[in-house]
């Protein structure tokens, strides 16, 4: 993803944690916060070291990023943080995609119905 679509600064993460609202399922927690300064979404991903080694954590992050790339045109202009939970480490990429889509629908991140 391009730099404009990333959240990297700790201050941005803290603002979203405090002012945003959260939705969760067993595998992911999603924090969302409106951002009027930009006209597209921004994504921050957090995968704890408790989930496994670097290879596994990066696999989870790649699957999350890929899901956002696929739905890029359907996502509202919000700041979004995705936190992976312990059960995500045993999932395939397709299962991660389905679970993430489920929690994003609950968080009302999409601007239209997704299958």
Swiss-Prot record:
GO molecular function, a single term: 3'-tRNA processing endoribonuclease activity
GO cellular component, one term: ribonuclease P complex
Keyword DNA-binding: no
Gene3D superfamilies: 3.30.230.10
Alphabetical UniProt keywords: Endonuclease, Hydrolase, Nuclease, RNA-binding, tRNA processing
EC number(s) recorded for this UniProt protein: 3.1.26.5
Enzyme class: hydrolase
Listed GO biological process terms: tRNA 5'-leader removal
Keyword tRNA processing assigned: yes
InterPro entries to which the protein is assigned, alphabetical: Ribosomal_Su5_D2-typ_SF, Ribsml_uS5_D2-typ_fold_subgr, RNase_P, RNase_P_CS
Catalytic activity as recorded in UniProt: Endonucleolytic cleavage of RNA, removing 5'-extranucleotides from tRNA precursor
Role noted for this protein: RNaseP catalyzes the removal of the 5'-leader sequence from pre-tRNA to produce the mature 5'-terminus. It can also cleave other RNA substrates such as 4.5S RNA. The protein component plays an auxiliary but essential role in vivo by binding to the 5'-leader sequence and broadening the substrate specificity of the ribozyme.
Quaternary structure annotation from Swiss-Prot or TrEMBL: Consists of a catalytic RNA component (M1 or rnpB) and a protein subunit.
Family: Belongs to the RnpA family.
Name under which the protein is recorded: Ribonuclease P protein component
């Amino acid at each position: 993803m391009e730099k404009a679509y990333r959240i990297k600064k700790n201050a941005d993460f803290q603002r979203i944690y405090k002012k945003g609202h959260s939705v969760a399922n067993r595998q992911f927690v999603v924090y969302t916060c409106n951002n009027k300064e930009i006209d597209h979404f921004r994504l921050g991903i957090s995968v704890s070291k408790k989930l496994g080694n670097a290879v596994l954590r990066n696999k989870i992050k790649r699957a999350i990023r890929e899901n956002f790339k696929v739905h890029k045109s359907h996502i509202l202009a919000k700041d979004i943080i995705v936190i992976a939970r312990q059960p995500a480490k045993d999932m395939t990429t397709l299962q991660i995609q389905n679970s993430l889509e489920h929690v994003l629908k609950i968080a009302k991140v999409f601007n239209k119905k997704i299958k």
